[in-house]
Amino acid sequence: MAHTRGISGLVGKLVMETEVNCNADKYYQIYKHHEDLPSAIPHIVTSAKAVEGHGTTSGCVKEWGYMHEGKTLTCKEKTTYNDETRTICHSISEGDLMNDYKKFDATLVVDPKDNGHGSIVKYILDYEKINEDSPVPIHYLALCNQATEDLNTYLCASV
């Protein structure tokens, strides 16, 4: 896990990489086909639906429900996909995150491991805090890590 801050202290980036046992395409596809996430990791993702466009097409808008620190929270975001690089970018525009951040982008990149067994899952959180009192979103990176590990368990069990 790495953290870098922008010059102003308001802008920053958090990066996390986790090794998983599952195939990179399988891991990427469950995130792309987001409707399966609430049944795969219901203790983290409580709902996921496309509200504009087709949910697997770049430019679609999705609404998410998720659990964080014992609370049910929501967000609305625009999603872009790059199937070739197995990259998904969520640009959050509405919801609970916007109470602390002017900008919040969560990028997921899934790469196959060089040995052909398993994958590397990378989350990149780019953010701009509303003010100095807004927290660095390390707790959201921890949530991403938990989702990665739990989804790995789910996907490997369903093989």
Swiss-Prot record:
Tissue expression, per UniProt?
Laticifer.
Q: Gene3D superfamilies from the xrefs?
A: 3.30.530.20
| Membrane is among the record's keywords | no
Q: What is its main location?
A: other
Q: GO cellular component terms? A: cytoplasmic vesicle; vacuole
Residue spans crossing the bilayer? none
InterPro entries to which the protein is assigned, alphabetical: Bet_v_I/MLP, MLP-like, START-like_dom_sf
Task: List S-S links within the chain.
Answer: none
User: Where does the record say this protein resides?
Assistant: Vacuole; Cytoplasmic vesicle
Q: Name one GO biological process term.
A: defense response
Write the record's keywords in alphabetical order, separated by commas: Cytoplasmic vesicle, Vacuole
Q: In its keyword annotation, does this UniProt entry include Magnesium?
A: no
Q: Could you tell me what this protein does?
A: Not known; MLPs constitute up to 50% of the soluble latex protein.
Query: Would you identify the family this protein belongs to, as annotated?
Result: Belongs to the MLP family.
For this entry, the protein name equals Major latex protein 149
**Lineage of this protein's species?**
Eukaryota, Viridiplantae, Streptophyta, Embryophyta, Tracheophyta
Q: What is this protein's gene name?
A: MLP149
